[in-house]
């Protein structure tokens, strides 16, 4: 059985495993480019941990559980095009939006101070 955790970050829930990278909504607590590369990241909103055959569920979060990681870079998602048109009225509006993302890699999943898997 593989070890993984389900976390809440950036308004969404992610199933994360150590050694893999993930994109979440941009972490801009203190400005756009405040978080640099290799900034350590501790995520405490862990909803569930699966380790070997044991499952630990939180209510709403697992006590004394953290996911350790580091930020790789800040990037932007693909452009989302919004096109509004009123038929027969010559009214058209085209706008685009690119969501800011933060890419981070998970280094370890910890429970009660012990690292479950590096």
Swiss-Prot record:
Name used for this protein in its record: Large ribosomal subunit protein bL21c
Subcellular location: Plastid, Chloroplast
Record's keyword terms, sorted: Chloroplast, Plastid, Ribonucleoprotein, Ribosomal protein, RNA-binding, rRNA-binding
Protein source organism: Zygnema circumcarinatum
Gene: rpl21
Superkingdom of the source species: Eukaryota
Main location: plastid
Biological process annotations from GO: translation
PROSITE patterns per UniProt: RIBOSOMAL_L21
């Amino acid at each position: 059985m593989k070890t993984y955790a389900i976390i809440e970050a950036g308004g969404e829930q992610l199933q994360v495993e150590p050694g893999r990278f993930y994109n979440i909504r941009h972490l801009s607590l203190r400005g756009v480019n405040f978080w640099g590369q290799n900034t350590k990241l501790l995520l405490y909103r862990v909803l569930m941990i699966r380790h070997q055959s044991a499952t630990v569920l939180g209510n709403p979060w697992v006590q004394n559980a953290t996911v350790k990681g580091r930020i790789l870079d800040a990037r932007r998602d693909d452009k989302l095009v919004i096109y509004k048109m009123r038929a027969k009225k010559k009214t058209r509006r085209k706008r685009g939006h690119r969501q800011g993302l933060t890419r981070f890699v998970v280094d370890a999943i910890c429970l009660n101070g012990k690292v479950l898997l590096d």
